[in-house]
């Protein structure tokens, strides 16, 4: 649905953030949709700087909003078939499953192993990573959950009753219409301080703006 609606960076850059968030619903953190929207605008605005349709080096990709070290390498590998090395949750699962480490390992310890496996593979980089991630997802579907062996592992809190739930509720209301603080507090069945706190955070992140007495999705 998202790709069908916004098939290119140029199309995505020309729509409002509210439009992006509406289509993004159910696809994950709304902050990521905002970063993607901003990245599309950056690519569109700096077309002449890159002298091509899309930045294709890790260094260029890392300049895009919200793109970090590993994400830039994942984009380079999948979009441009470059032999960049990165680790994500399903890749960790595969290596932990076959290594069976007795102690927790960091991504820095896993990266040389991924690099060696990629170099020895007869597959193209994008095929290698697609297969690796599909395999990791398959292991998880079989009930094999090993990410606790990662030195970076943090157990995610339950969604029910979380601040993530409050943020989602606020954005859903504001996608329908502009609202005052009093209206939001009335419509969202949570502690009023929680609603106020998350509104402040959403404003700080550039997802929500205040126009007089009314809150709205940032334009």
Task: Set out the residue ranges of the language-model regions.
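Short secondary-structure capping/turn micro-motifs that flank functional sites
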Residues: 40, 218-219
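Residues in the recognition helix of alpha-helical DNA-binding motifs
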Residues: 75, 197-201, 216-218
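Short amphipathic alpha-helical interaction segments
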Residues: 189-203
């Amino acid at each position: 649905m998202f790709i069908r609606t916004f098939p290119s960076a140029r199309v995505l850059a020309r729509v409002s953030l509210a439009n992006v968030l509406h289509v993004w619903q159910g696809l994950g953190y709304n902050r990521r949709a905002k970063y993607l929207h901003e990245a599309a605008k950056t690519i569109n605005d700096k077309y002449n700087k890159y002298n091509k349709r899309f930045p294709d080096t890790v260094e260029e990709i890392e300049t895009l909003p919200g793109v970090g070290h590993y994400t830039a390498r994942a984009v380079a590998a999948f979009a441009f078939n470059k032999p960049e090395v990165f680790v994500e949750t399903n890749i960790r699962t595969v290596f932990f499953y076959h290594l069976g480490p007795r102690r927790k390992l960091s991504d820095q310890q896993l990266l040389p192993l991924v690099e060696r496996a990629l170099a020895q593979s007869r597959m193209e980089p994008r095929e290698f990573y697609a297969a690796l991630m599909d395999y990791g997802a398959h292991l998880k579907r079989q009930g094999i959950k090993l990410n606790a062996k990662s030195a970076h592992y943090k157990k995610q809190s339950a969604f029910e009753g979380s601040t993530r739930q409050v943020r989602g509720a606020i954005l859903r209301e504001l996608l329908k219409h502009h609202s005052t603080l009093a209206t939001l507090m009335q419509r969202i069945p949570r502690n009023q301080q929680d609603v106020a706190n998350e509104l402040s955070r959403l404003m700080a992140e550039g997802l929500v703006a205040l126009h007089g007495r009314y809150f709205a999705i940032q334009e």
